[in-house]
């Protein structure tokens, strides 16, 4: 049986690599790519759906936009943040920590993926083995913050 998979965070390095690997797998029939990218183009095996991991309503709407009979063999969550282009960066000192930065990091790395589980787990295939997986980068690595 051909597989249907979802990759949440498909624009990041990890998510994009997972998508490329899945597209090369002949047993995969469809890949649903979820990201903040406003990409409405679809390829043969690929469907793009908007999702904002920081917004519960967006996560819910992403599942509501799925075709009614969609069942996933694999849901792969590859979201995460260590830094962004603006205000979030690895803290080298306790003085670098702020409420807003902590909320952003916790939302993207913990709360958002948990909410993805809330809304996406009902779409896992129940008639055969299915997998819900989370993977993030080495956010806790001291080598990344040059201490």
Protein language model regions, located:
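Conserved small/polar residues in nucleotide/adenosyl-binding loops
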Residues: 145-147
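Conserved glycine-rich Rossmann-like NAD(P)H-binding loop of the short-chain dehydrogenase/reductase
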Residues: 23, 27-41
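Rossmann-fold cofactor-recognition segment
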Residues: 44-57
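Amphipathic alpha-helical dimer-interface segment in Rossmann-like NAD(P)H-dependent oxidoreductases
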Residues: 19, 107-128
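Catalytic Tyr-X3-Lys loop
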Residues: 93-114
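N-terminal Rossmann NAD(P)H-binding glycine-rich loop of SDR-like oxidoreductase domains
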Residues: 10-23
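Conserved NAD(P)H cofactor-binding loop of Rossmann-fold oxidoreductase domains
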Residues: 76-90
């Amino acid at each position: 049986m051909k597989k249907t998979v979802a990759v949440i965070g498909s624009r990041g390095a990890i998510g994009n690599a997972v998508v490329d690997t899945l597209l090369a797998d002949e047993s995969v029939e469809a890949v649903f790519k979820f990201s903040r990218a406003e990409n409405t183009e679809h390829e043969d095996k690929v469907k793009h759906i908007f999702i904002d991991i920081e917004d519960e309503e967006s996560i819910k709407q992403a599942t509501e936009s799925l075709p009614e009979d969609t069942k996933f063999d694999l849901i792969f969550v590859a979201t995460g943040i260590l830094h962004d282009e603006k205000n979030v960066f690895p803290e080298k000192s306790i003085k670098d920590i702020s409420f807003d930065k902590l909320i952003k990091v916790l939302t993207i790395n913990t709360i958002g993926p948990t909410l993805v589980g809330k809304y996406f787990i009902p779409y896992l295939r129940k008639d055969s083995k299915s997998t819900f997986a989370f993977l993030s980068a080495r956010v806790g690595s001291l080598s990344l913050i040059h201490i």
